[in-house]
Amino acid sequence: MLDKIIRIATRQSPLALWQAHYVQHLLQANHPGLQIELVPMVTRGDIILDTPLAKVGGKGLFVKELELALLDGRADIAVHSMKDVPIAFPEGLGLVTICEREDPRDAFVSSHYAHLDDLPAGSVVGTSSLRRQCQLRERRPDLIIRDLRGNVGTRLAKLDNGDYQAIILAVAGLKRLGLENRIRYAMSAEESLPAVGQGAVGIECRLDDDHTRQLLAPLNHRHTELRVCAERAMNIRLEGGCQVPIGSYAELEGDTLWLRALVGAPDGSQMIRGERRGPAAEAEQMGIELADELLSLGAREILAAVYLDNPAR
């Protein structure tokens, strides 16, 4: 069973390579002697850096090339940040494993200010995420929010060069890259509700590849799977892409799941929020019901306007 080399498709960014090596380590810890080969590749999202993500087109922006490698046999598994995984998969492919989640919160990063509330009016804050932008603008309408693209190192360099007074990044990414010291503070879910699946690593493979699926089975983290299942069910019901102003965060308290979600207008003028508590075994249904509640409260109109402005989504 271990004589076949498992090939991992991954993006070439430092964070993506960290995730691929992380999965490699888990696989080899569970299956000593297993041979693994990384297949680094460049995605469309890595190439187009001069356009806001929402306008490039959010569906599969960072995963399509990896999925093509699975379909044509160049790779056996693809490792993704769950927040980048589209709501639908190509025929024959699927998400089979979700690894244990790292801290899902957003990080406030600044060279001179300790807290978002400390920023003077007119300060420039960098983020390309519509989800982060709408929450920032609701809380601090006096700030200037500008797009910020590139890998983590590039973004930090732009901050250090004085292009921004602060930037918002994922806590998980900074921790994984050994850059935890750059975090001024981790923003609470009340302050900045995370993205669907943020902080979790997902593994995609061919659904008919039973050998690979058996190898991956021990890597699945059930608690993380339930939380991400609820978040993704909500997003699927909303027909949300990866680059839309949707936040969702599920927490497990014993056997009880607490799911929070929001849909916001990018300018911060409207914010629809909701939450659900229920049995963890009903995670998917809770996500669907919460999405229906948000839609009934006006989320449909907000998202329609976003898609009109960003038809590529």
UniProtKB/Swiss-Prot annotation:
One of its GO terms (cellular component) is cytoplasm. It catalyses: 4 porphobilinogen + H2O = hydroxymethylbilane + 4 NH4(+). Gene3D superfamilies: Periplasmic binding protein-like II (3.40.190.10), Porphobilinogen deaminase, C-terminal domain (3.30.160.40). The modification S-(dipyrrolylmethanemethyl)cysteine is found at C242. Tetrapolymerization of the monopyrrole PBG into the hydroxymethylbilane pre-uroporphyrinogen in several discrete steps. Belongs to the HMBS family. This is Porphobilinogen deaminase.
